[in-house]
Amino acid sequence: MTKYRLLILLLLFFAISFSWAKEALALTNQLTEASTQFTRIDKTFISQGDKLKAWLYLPSGVLTPPVVIMAHGFGGQRWMRLPAYAERFAQMGMAVFVFDYRGFNDSEGEPRNYVNPARHLEDWDAAIAYVKTLNTVDAKRMALWGTSFSGGHVIVEAAKYPEISAVVAQVPFTDGISTAWNNYILDDPMFALKGTYHGVADILVSLFTKHRHNVRIAGRPGEAFAMMSKPDSMQGVLKLTGISDEKDFESTNFCPGNIVFTLTFYRPISRANKVACPALIIGAEKDTLFPPKGPKKMADKMKKATYISMPMGHFDPYVGEPFQKLVKIMGDFLKTNLRVSSAK
């Protein structure tokens, strides 16, 4: 009887081991297949005298593919979920150039984490100029991709460069005046007062010293002042970083306080009617950071805009089901307008 039990246990052991081995082999094959669909190359380019860091994704087996240029939103860095988009687009046959702004991550530039629309737009200009020099991509088929704050940047840039073939703006920042009034002054007057204090403090500190007065980028309601302090802000940002403990995020959770003023008077929507290329604008119906109707208003000002809205919050597009749905919609839009071969 003991021998039979031992035999049964051995058979079960081998069956389970075979099942695990089969699953591991399948996963290995999937990873190998994905890794052979594109390569990622470290790149460095210059903006206003500083070295900016970037990744260039190149699809395998495609000579001079079209290219998508992307950068992150407010206080974001390129490793925060942007590779998820870049990899999917590369698998669809497009090159992707993902860069960090001056002062962020491993890019040079002072002050650190300086969120400034004019400065960011200079970096976009430099990225576009650099990508045009690459002989590994077809810069005549170029798209711009932005999200949140950079969703506004790509609209401004597309209006500036008529040769751009397509633009994608995900949950974009559209109008600083409307955002400040509707989402902050009316909703939380104390936020406006505290923001004014920190903005003035930063200006004074920077005038008389070499330092900056920093504020937190993300926080929770009732905590120390943060530029993004809605109920879903901190958890939303942590989703992008993959960091579970927000204490581990605090070392990069800051930016100079004068953004309170520069953000208020930044209005990408004022340039929307100058965008000539096809545009995909994606809105979030439950957005608490920006007015939910802003993306639709911006799309209505464009000549060739497609507008999509989803019942989601500002930070939801980056993961889970919203990401899976939207990345396919974006990919199909880009493939069509960048004339990607259907053979890929």
Predicted features by range, described:
Residues 156-243:
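Alpha/beta-hydrolase-fold enzymes
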Residues 275, 281-283:
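Short beta-strand/loop motif that positions the catalytic acidic residue
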Residues 310-344:
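Catalytic active-site module of serine/aspartate enzymes centered on a nucleophile-bearing elbow/loop
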Residues 78, 104-139, 320-321, 326:
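Catalytic nucleophile-loop/oxyanion-hole region of alpha/beta-hydrolase
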Residues 27-61:
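N-terminal cap/lid segment of alpha/beta-hydrolase-fold proteins
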Residues 288-294:
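Conserved alpha/beta-hydrolase "acid-adjacent" motif
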Residues 75-87, 101:
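The serine-hydrolase catalytic nucleophile loop
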Residues 88-108:
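Conserved alpha/beta-hydrolase
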